[in-house]
Regions:
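A structural signal for multi-pass alpha-helical bundles of membrane permease subunits
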Residues: 3-264
Length: 264
């Protein structure tokens, strides 16, 4: 064995071992537990595919899937619309462009739980007080089973817009100026310019952002943990939160392992 191959193995094997221990092995154990009635502690029995069949008849599980996909779709649309508008503005010829880009990226580097608890205080105390001063009821949006999900969308969008904006700016900077010059000769301005020239050329970046947003929002957990903890009346219970809450403290480790396998 030559020195180059030995070095390659010395670098690769520890990484693969760590990946197997902290990623692959828990995945395998989760799949195994999904065929049991394991409660997270003590003994357990094999139940076959009963956990999987019960998942399709459990109303709470179905409700969490509907909520998660609704949240993911709405948040993905909101984030991409806002990100694209911001990217177009920050890519134009304006003063302090670099400083503004840095400022808009700040939310992305903050912890999701920290942001969630800050917005929790805002929605619970500050916003109701302002609404009361304006003559409204002043009820917290987080206490409404009808509107609490909107607060989660707002927090998710506020924190996610930054990264998507950067990706869109990267896409806009790949568009040659010659294209715009040729388009202006043909009378393309404003909306026509964006629709016929800009958007088709940044379509790959749009696709990337849509996929990343959908993936991230389908796994939403931190914001729900900080804002609503799945309430009120389980109206904002995402799949990830349901798996965590009922699996860890609800004695449904095996059942929720099956849920996690299906969701995976």
């Amino acid at each position: 064995m030559n020195g180059r191959k030995r070095t390659f193995l010395l670098i690769t094997i520890p990484i693969l071992a760590l990946f197997f221990c902290f990623n692959t092995l828990p995945l395998i154990k989760g799949v195994i537990y999904s065929f049991t009635n394991f409660r997270g502690y003590g003994e357990f029995d094999w139940v076959g595919i009963r956990n999987y069949t019960d998942l399709f008849t459990d109303a709470r599980v179905g409700k969490s899937y509907l909520f998660t996909f609704k949240l993911a779709i709405v948040a993905t649309i909101v984030v991409n619309v806002l990100s694209l508008v911001l990217a177009l503005g920050l890519n134009s010829k304006i003063k302090f462009k670099s400083a503004l880009r840095g400022m808009y990226f700040v939310p992305n580097i903050l912890g999701a739980l920290v942001v969630g608890y800050i917005f929790n205080y805002f929605f619970t105390y500050i916003l109701p007080t302002v609404v009361k001063m304006m003559g409204g009821k002043g009820d917290s949006i987080l206490a409404s089973s009808k509107w609490a999900w909107v607060a989660i969308v707002i927090v998710c969008a506020w924190q996610s817009v930054a990264m998507n904006t950067i990706i869109y700016i990267s896409g806009l900077q790949t568009v040659p100026e010659d294209v715009y010059e040729a388009g202006s000769l043909d009378g393309a301005t404003g909306w026509k310019k964006f629709k016929n020239l800009t958007f088709p050329l940044i379509l790959p970046f749009f696709t990337i952002n849509m996929v990343l947003c959908m993936k991230n929002f389908l796994m939403v957990f931190d914001q729900i943990m900080a804002l609503t903890k799945g309430g009120p009346a389980q109206s904002t219970e995402s799949i990830s939160y349901l798996i965590y809450n009922n699996g860890m403290s609800g004695g449904q480790f095996g059942f929720q392992s099956g849920n996690a396998v299906i969701f995976f």
